[in-house]
Structures are given as structure tokens and as C-alpha cells.
Amino acid sequence: MSVIIALAALALLMLAAYRGYSVILFAPIAALGAVLLTDPSAVAPAFTGVFMEKMVGFIKLYFPVFLLGAVFGKLIELSGFSRSIVAAAIRLLGTRQAMLVIVLVCALLTYGGVSLFVVVFAVYPFAAEMFRQSNIPKRLIPATIALGAFSFTMDALPGTPQIQNIIPSTFFNTTAWAAPWLGVIGTIFVFCAGMLFLQRQRNKAQRTGEGYGSDLRNEPETAADIKLPNPWIALSPLLAVGIMNLLFTQWIPQWYGKTHSLALPGMATPVTTEIAKLTAIWAVQAALLVGILMVLAFGYKAISRKLAEGSKSAVSGALLAAMNTASEYGFGAVIASLPGFLVLADWLKSIPNPLVNEAVTVTLLAGITGSASGGMSIALAAMANDFIAAAHAANIPLEVMHRVAAMASGGMDTLPHNGAVITLLAVTGLTHREAYKDIFCITLIKTLAVFVVIGTFYATGIV
């Protein structure tokens, strides 16, 4: 019964998200409904001590990233930079390669360390302009961005600095470059299968006469009478964000050391900060500030006429996206504390094959919590020692366990209630009904990829 309660809460939230209801409202309803059916006296403590605690913690860490990312994306849009880059890309590659261009831009940014949430805000103006000029249905933009930002550069490509590839290293004593050949094989599979699917959907839309669409929401705005800047100038802030993110990641620990104690005159006691835990977040924030200043410096004349209105729109978008994702985070924390979740986790331990056990466990928990990093963290915290023992017994290198865990986390995490999916749809102005089925097909490809990698390892022994 406890498992049914946990799964029912998940089903309710997924249904609410798919039908367009606010996740900010339904995430606590679904989570606390499950608590009510488990232990009615625990509802209020669970809401304050678990749901709100995790939700507020997420906002504390990530809202500045959402805000700066939204402002950066809006300035890219108002300055005409997005139109300039799209025009140059179409001249160079033609309209047939619009999807490939967006996938590669997303992949380069995420592999450079830019948060996938930031990529959504930054790339959407380019994607919308390119899809409009190529007359590709707007509903395919989320799936295209998901393929580039939420898949192979998130967890498969060796060396990616995304958190999904870093978490396993702390449990298996490996590096971000673990099992490089298996990672490359997984990357090729996801990229090729994803591009074939997207091209198939585009061709299908063309045969039925479906174009970009009309009466759409959240359409990027660029004044028609502005002179478009040089595409290299337009591209420079985007490149700067990726490069400066890498540089600040190296510089911040050198400036502050391992910890920093803040002692201002009005503070009763000093506040000590562990720099390692915040380096990645601070680096992204600083890099985005550099990008924003560059866009303002190069395109202020075009931006100034709509800066006030555009900044309000960016703040509203950032608030909605951050609150949606934070609510998901709180939901996952509550569900993970229920007995049904523990029963499910114990059942998963019974799968005999170590790699299949790990893959199924991580991807299911990522799906239930709606978070790749959250599901993987829960799975590895509870079962890493069992996975390591089973791997040693079966002579499986821990590098392979690392790569399988990372890729499995990026499988079923993109279900309808996933925070990144909800953010992506909110930013693009689309609904689950309009765009989620294509995202789900990318999700299936991602989920299948980890089992392709497992099969490749057993067939060839390649690592």
C-alpha cells in the first residue's frame, strides 16, 4: 500500500503538469496528500520541515542563476543578436540545418559548463528566430533544446562538468572522464537517434502543411527597424559565458581558499562558507554578469527602447521557472522520505546484474523525484557500497559503474513533472499538450542509451 501511495502522488503531479495546472500549487498538494495517507499527524511537519526546507534551499542556491540567465536571454533577444546569428547560420548552412545548429549550440554551452537552465533562457531566442525563418513548427523547439542540453552533454560525453557527471565520482572515486569510450558510444547513439527523430517530425509536419504557427506565446521581440550587428559580435557574449564560466571555476577557489569567514560589523557571529560547494554556482553567476555587460556594451542603443519592459518580463520568467523547479525539488524530498519509496528502493536491490541493477535503480528514482541529480544522489547514497561490492565480485571497473549511473540519471528524469521540462515549456510559451510528446521521445532515446552502453561493455569489454 505504501508503494501505491508514493506512485499515486507521482501520477497526480504528472497528470496536473500535463494538463497545464500549476506545479507550484500541485507539487505540495500531491506530496502532502501522500503524507496524509501515510501519517496524518506528519502533514504540517513534513510541509515545513521537508517540503519548504528543500524548496527554500533550492531558491537560495539557484534563483540568481535563473534571474541572470533570464536577463541574459532577454537582452540577447532585444539587441537583435539572436536574429544576427540566425541570419548568419542560415546563410552558411541553409534552413535545412536549423535543428542541427540549435542542438550543437546547446551541446557546446552545456559541455562548456553552462547550466542547462541558463541554456534554455539563452538559446530560446535563437531557436525561435531560426525555426520561424525555416518554417519549422515551434512545438519542436523544446525537444530540440532537450536533445542538445538535457542529454549527451549532461551525462554521457566524457569530461562534461555538469553535476550529473560529477556526483558519481564522489561515490566511486573516479573522475569526470570515467569510461570515455562507453561515454562516446552513448553520445553517438543519443545524438544520431535524436536527430533522426527530430528530422522525421519536421518532415511529417511539412507533409501536412504545418508551419511555425501563429498566435503564439512568449515570442522573442526584436525591433524591425534596428540594424543587425556583426554576427561575430553577436556571438561573442555567448562564447564569453562559456569561457568565463571555466575561468571563474578555476579562479574562485584560488581567491577564497577552501572556506571563507564573513564577519561584518553588524553580524553577531561570522558566517563560514565552504567554497567548494558554491564554486560552480558562483562561476556561472559571474560568467552571466560578464555576458550581460557585453550585450549592453555592444547593443545598448537597440536595447534601451525596451529595456524597462524587457527586464520586467525577464524577472517574471525567472520567478516562474525557479518556483516551478523548486516546488519539484520539495516534492521529491517528501516522496523520498516516505516508506513506500524505501520499499521500492529495497526491491530494486534484488536485480542480480550489477550494471542493470544500477541503471534501473537510478533512472526510476530520477523519474520518481523528477530530478536526475536528486534521483542519482538518493540511489548512490543508499546503495553505492552494494554497487561497489557487486562490481568487484563481477570484475566490473568502477569507471563503468560511474558512466552507467550518470547516463541512467538522464533517462526517465524528464517526465512531465521534471523541473527542467516545466522551465523549458514555460520559457518557450508552450504547454505539455503541445510539445511534451516530442520531449518524451527524446526521453525514451536517453533511457535506451544506457542499456546500449551496458550491452556494448558486455559484448566488447571496452571502457
Question: Residue spans of the language-model regions?
Answer:
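Long, contiguous bundles of hydrophobic transmembrane helices that form the permeation core
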Residues: 6, 38, 181-310, 427-428, ...
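Interfacial loop-to-transmembrane junctions
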Residues: 89, 93, 424-445
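Alpha-helical transmembrane segments of multi-pass membrane proteins
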Residues: 96-109, 136-153, 179-188, 354-368, ...
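Short helix-coil transition sites and intra-membrane helix breaks within transmembrane domains
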Residues: 19-23, 59-62, 73-83, 109-122, ...
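Hydrophobic alpha-helical transmembrane segments of multi-pass integral membrane proteins
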Residues: 63-69, 92-129, 322-330, 351-389
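Re-entrant/interfacial helical elements at transmembrane boundaries that shape
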Residues: 70, 84-86, 117-130, 159-171, ...
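Hydrophobic core segments of alpha-helical transmembrane domains in multi-pass membrane transport
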Residues: 5-17, 28-37, 66-71, 105-110, ...
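Core transmembrane alpha-helical segments of multi-pass membrane transporters/permeases
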Residues: 25-28, 48-83, 108, 275-340
